Amino acid sequence: MEKKNIDWSSIGFGYIPTDKRFVANYKNGAWDEGVLTSDPMVTISECAGVLQYAQTCFEGMKAYTTEDGHIVTFRPDLNAERMESSCKRLEMPVFPKERFVDAVVQTVAANEAYVPPYGSGATLYIRPYMFGSDAVIGVKPANEYQFRIFTTPVGPYFKGGAKPITIRVCDYDRAAPHGTGHIKAGLNYAMSLYAIMDAHRQGYDENMYLDAATRTKVEETGGANFLFVTKDNKVVTPKSNSILPSITRRSLLVVAKDYLGLEVEEREVYFDEVKDFAECGLCGTAAVISPVGKIVDHGKEICFPSGMTEMGPITKKLYETLTGIQMGRIQAPEGWIKVIK
């Protein structure tokens, strides 16, 4: 199929409508078959559960054109499983895993012309989401729901190379103990908006959230997990019940251990030990890894030996290996790549 006439090198990380999106409705205790539609508009009750009580969750993933010309997605089964966890915590009906993956395949295939070519640095971003759609005036779960998937082409997250960012230790809390920090709920991101805009106004790129209970342990940022590298090249990621289980982070730990032969640790990371790490990065779907060069704790600077000019050597190897797997340049572990075409 001929690609759309898009300057792939100039598009940013924003919304560009594509031709088709998937829609399924839940009513009377069951999901319908779902359809692909050209209509990008959502029509719901003014009293819909999503509008009144934020009953919504979502996922984020990408489709790629590989080196040999295939269109693929990366570990969509894990997105389905994570969305299942989100739905259960928010008292929403689960959209079955097999149907989730099939709907992703249908949607990407229907928008094949928008999948950027190999080597462009761009990808097709995929956004599955679900929300309570019928009227709810009392505080309770909705009775009807809609599951949708739209896609949009996005440019390379880093134009001109990945430059290390500066983040601050945030005075606000992202998630409460035993709360919803471990799921991908819209309400978590709404709560982070003031904090991230405040960080930007103060000249910082991102926030480092500490645990709400003791404010001594590293959790995550508003939209990415932390990854640290020790001075003896051990890869360490924070572990907490309040952290979203990043699929990128899980994959990077496998890459570190099985592809690079590095020791890995998932454990509680105390803020006091951050100054002793050699490298720091933020990992997620959008950028894979964003290198962190400096953390500012109320005026006190922690500068990583990797510096402010480029990724640290281990972070760079992790990034290059995982993106190589996603783009088909490196053999993937079994089950990681879902071929669409």
Feature names for model-found ranges:
Residues 1-107, 136-341:
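Helix-start/capping segments and mature chain N-termini
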Residues 97-99, 107-121:
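Charged, gly/pro-rich active-site loop segments
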